[in-house]
C-alpha cells in the first residue's frame, strides 16, 4: 500500500491551495493508494480545511502521522509554483502551469453579477506597496470605478475611497461572490489563488519585490505597481525579514 502524507506548515488559504492538486496527481499518476493531510498542518481559517481538503475526493482525510512539507519560492524556468511543488513531492503528470483545485461548485448570486469588486485584504507580502493612493491612482488611470470594496478582515489591507462595503460569512459564499462578480481586483493574496481554483480570471495588483512564484496563474492579469515605500518603510521591511529568519515557517 503506497501512502503519501502531506504536511502544510504555512496556514493561509492560498498556501493550502498550492498543494490542492497533489492528491489527484498522486493517485492518477503517482501510483499512490492513499493520500492524507497531516493533522500537524496549520490552518488560519477552519473553512480552509473544509473547502480545500474535506471536499477533495482524492484525499483519504487526515492522519496524526507526520507528513512531508516542502516549499520554495525559487521556481525554475518553465514551471509555476504548483508544478514545482508537484515535482518536489516526486510526482509528475507531465503537464505544466497547473492551477489550484477545489471541488466546491460555486453558486451564481444575482446581486454580484454586474459588480466590479476590489478586495483590499492581504496577510503576507504583496510587494513594496502599502498606501491607498497607489491603488486609487491606478484605478483612476485605468478608468475603473469599483462598485464595492470587501470589508477589512482584521489583517493588513490597502483600502481605497469606496463607500460601498461588502462581505461574506465564510469561504464558500466568498467563492460564490468571486464566481458571480463582473470583475475582481485584489492584491497578491489567497483571493487570486482561490479565483484560479474556480477558473475565474481576476486582476492582481502587486508591488516591486514580489517573487514570481506568487504570480502563478495563467488565468490572471498581474499588474506591477512599482513601489511607494518610504525610507522608514524599507527599514521596517528589513527588520521584518530578519525576524522571519528566526520564526517557524508556519507562524509567518
Protein language model regions, located:
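Catalytic machinery of carbohydrate-active enzymes
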Residues: 1-252
